Amino acid sequence: ATRQELEATIESVELAMQEDNTANRNTTLGGYGELHYNNLDKGSAIDFHRYVLFLNHQFADNLNFYSELEVEHSIAGEGKVGEVELEQAFVQWDYSQSHNFKFGLFLIPLGILNETHEPDTFYGVERNTVEKNIIPATWWEGGFGFNGELAPGWGYDLAFHSGLNLDADNASASKRSNIRSA
């Protein structure tokens, strides 16, 4: 009887593991880190520039959750240059093979670098000055949006979001610093 009980226990554990693995395949965890060494005239420095975690979940074939949490410059707090940011957290519904709808916190579809801003998409260690100080790279807002492909090479990206902080009294209304976080 002991051998039969042992085999039954092993079989039930194997079944439980198979069920657990099936459920876990719907959730993915990923990320990347970026460590910089800069040797400049004013001194050299090492900076863990960013550490990014992705957590995604597929509820159904056409319904997904995407999120991105980022820690910049290793340290955050009063008097420190670091930041902890929730850059993305949105649900996307693929209502057809070529079109989808999303809502939540997402990257605004503007420019070349905003939605594809990972370190391997620009040349060098740092982003160039225009993309770093003028164009809002990594600009996210809360809202909803549609995107898709009408024909090969003809796509669209339309978003309704919380917008820019362009106060008329703001002397620097054209600067990147006026982008507010949702």
Which residue stretches match the model-derived regions?
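Surface-exposed coil loops of outer-membrane beta-barrel proteins
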Residues: 76-80, 97-182
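N-terminal periplasmic/intermembrane-space "pro-region" immediately following the signal or transit peptide
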Residues: 1-37
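Surface-exposed strand-loop-strand hairpins of Gram-negative outer-membrane beta-barrel proteins
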Residues: 22-28, 36-50, 173-177
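Transmembrane beta-strands of outer-membrane beta-barrel pores
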Residues: 35-41, 50-52, 71-75, 107-109, ...
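Surface-exposed extracellular loop regions of Gram-negative outer-membrane beta-barrel proteins
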Residues: 46-76
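Outer-membrane beta-barrel strand-turn architecture
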Residues: 23, 59-61, 95-97, 150-152
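Residues on the lipid-exposed face of transmembrane beta-strands in outer-membrane beta-barrel proteins
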Residues: 31, 53-57, 89-93, 103, ...
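Transmembrane beta-strands of outer-membrane beta-barrel proteins
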Residues: 27-33, 65-67, 101-103, 156-158
